[in-house]
C-alpha cells in the first residue's frame, strides 16, 4: 500500500491477505495488480520477508531500487507470483483513477471525501463506484489521466 492511494478498501486488503496466507506455500508474492483489474489506486502487494530481502539485495536498476517489488514481478522465473483479480469480466484499471499524482487527482480525491466521508466512517470501492455513477462530472475531473495509470 502506497501513500498516493487514499481510497484503500479494507475488504480488498483482507481478500488479498487471506489469499496470500491460504497459498503462502505456493507464492512468494501476491498482489491485485499483476495483471491489474481494480481501479488504479486500490493496488496492494504482499510478500514473504525473504522475498523482499532477496529483491533488495539483487536490485541494481534505479527503478527497482525505488519500487523494490518491480524486481519481483518482473522475474516470474525466480519468484512465484500470485494475483487476485476483481473478476473475469470486470476490469476497472484503465477507466477508474483513484490515485494521487496530479492536481486533478487531488480535486477528485477532495470531492470523494467531501461527499462520502462523514463522522469517521469508512467507505469502500462499491460505494465510490455507486457515487460516481450518480455524479459522472466528478469522475471526469481526472478521467483524462487514466491513460497514465500504471503499476510500479
Report the location of each language-model feature.
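Active-site cores that bind ATP or allylic diphosphates and position pyrophosphate for catalysis
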Residues: 61, 65, 74
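A recurrent flexible, glycine/aromatic-enriched loop bordering the glycosyltransferase active site
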Residues: 32-43, 91-92
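Active-site acidic Asp-centered loop
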Residues: 1-3
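A conserved catalytic-core signature of glycosyltransferases
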Residues: 41-42, 47, 67, 95-96
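Conserved alpha/beta core of the MobA/IspD/sugar-nucleotide pyrophosphorylase nucleotidyltransferase superfamily
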Residues: 69-152
Amino acid at each position: 500500500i502506497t501513500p498516493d492511494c487514499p481510497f484503500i478498501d479494507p475488504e480488498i486488503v483482507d481478500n488479498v491477505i487471506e489469499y496470500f496466507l491460504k497459498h503462502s506455500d505456493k507464492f512468494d508474492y501476491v498482489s491485485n495488480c499483476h495483471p491489474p483489474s481494480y481501479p488504479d489506486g486500490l493496488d496492494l502487494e504482499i510478500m514473504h520477508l525473504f522475498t523482499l530481502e532477496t529483491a533488495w539485495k539483487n536490485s541494481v536498476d534505479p527503478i527497482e531500487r525505488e519500487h523494490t517489488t518491480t524486481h519481483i514481478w518482473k522475474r516470474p522465473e525466480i519468484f512465484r507470483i500470485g494475483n487476485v483479480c476483481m473478476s473475469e469480466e470486470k476490469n476497472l484499471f484503465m477507466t477508474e483513477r483513484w490515485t494521487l499524482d496530479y492536481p486533478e487527482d487531488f480535486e477528485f480525491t477532495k470531492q470523494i471525501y467531501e461527499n462520502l466521508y462523514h463522522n469517521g466512517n469508512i467507505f469502500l470501492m462499491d460505494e465510490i463506484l455507486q457515487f460516481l455513477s450518480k455524479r459522472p462530472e466528478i469522475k471526469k475531473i481526472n478521467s483524462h489521466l487514466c491513460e497514465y495509470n500504471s503499476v510500479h
